[in-house]
Amino acid sequence: MNHCFLILFTLIVFTVVWSLEENEEYPDEDEMIESFMDGYSYRGDDGTCILKGDHCHGTCDCCGWTTTCRKSKSAGGKICKSEGSSISAFNAIAKGVAAMKKAKCKHKSG
């Protein structure tokens, strides 16, 4: 029983350490999602999608992917800001779900 616990504990520690490391070989997930969000076919022809970084008054929604409309001192008003977690593993899962929703949206609109 102790061996199983040690193996499980070692795997958990390894996974946490690996997720905390920044890998410079791959582009940043935020940059990838942002470039996808800025795509013409994703925003739609009528420009109805309100995305991360856009000025807003209430909610920010595009094809079911919702972010929060918050005050920004640097932008001089309210802008859409993405939700996130300080734990990179949770962010990776959230970004994966977001990418799937966006891909579905892009497929429907284009």
UniProtKB/Swiss-Prot annotation:
Disulfide bonds join C49-C63, C56-C69, C60-C105, C62-C80. Residues 1-19 form the signal peptide. One of its GO terms (cellular component) is extracellular region. It is found in: Secreted. Expressed by the venom gland. Residues 20-43 form a propeptide. Its main location: secreted. The keyword Secreted applies. The keyword Nucleotide-binding does not apply. GO terms for molecular function: ion channel regulator activity; toxin activity. Keywords: Disulfide bond, Ion channel impairing toxin, Knottin, Secreted, Signal, Toxin. Belongs to the neurotoxin 03 (Tx2) family. 02 subfamily. Probable ion channel inhibitor. The presence of a 'disulfide through disulfide knot' structurally defines this protein as a knottin. This is U32-theraphotoxin-Cg1a.
